[in-house]
Amino acid sequence: MAKFLLLNGPNLNLLGTREPQIYGSQTLAQICDTLREQAKAHGHVLEDFQSNAEHELVERVHRASREGIDFILINPGAFTHTSIALRDALLGVAIPFIEVHLSNVHAREPFRHKSYLSDVARGVIMGLGPKGYALALDAAIHLTQKN
């Protein structure tokens, strides 16, 4: 049994109401419920955590190492483009991770084109809406079974 951690950054708690033309109509709770069921169907466990505070996400990454988390799925939200601290935390715990974005950040404003995580992520999935989370979990399951 593998243990997965889904991390969501700032403003993702507003999913379902925030700019649905960009982010879709599903709530974060619905996405998390779907992923927990998907993990369970494969005999695994998925925990989720969302915060608008950078330090809380960093602390959750640190705790993941002590808890034996095998793989992290992360939608860092706006911290994608700003957070060296989150990058350093992920590198520090050496847990493989996939970066997920609901929208295609490269089709949006230029300031969203830079990611501090993509070059150290195991993979990046973007622009596929909530389905991107499910695809990321499928990939993480495959990669943990392979190792």
UniProtKB/Swiss-Prot annotation:
The keyword Lyase applies. The active site is at Y23, H101. Keywords: Amino-acid biosynthesis, Aromatic amino acid biosynthesis, Lyase. It catalyses: 3-dehydroquinate = 3-dehydroshikimate + H2O. It is an enzyme of class 4 (lyase). GO terms for molecular function: 3-dehydroquinate dehydratase activity. Substrate binds at N75, H81, D88, L102, S103, R112. InterPro entries: DHquinase_II (IPR001874), DHquinase_II_CS (IPR018509), DHquinase_II_sf (IPR036441). NCBIfam families: aroQ, PRK05395.1-1, PRK05395.1-2, PRK05395.1-3, PRK05395.1-4. Homododecamer. Catalyzes a trans-dehydration via an enolate intermediate. This is 3-dehydroquinate dehydratase. The gene is aroQ.
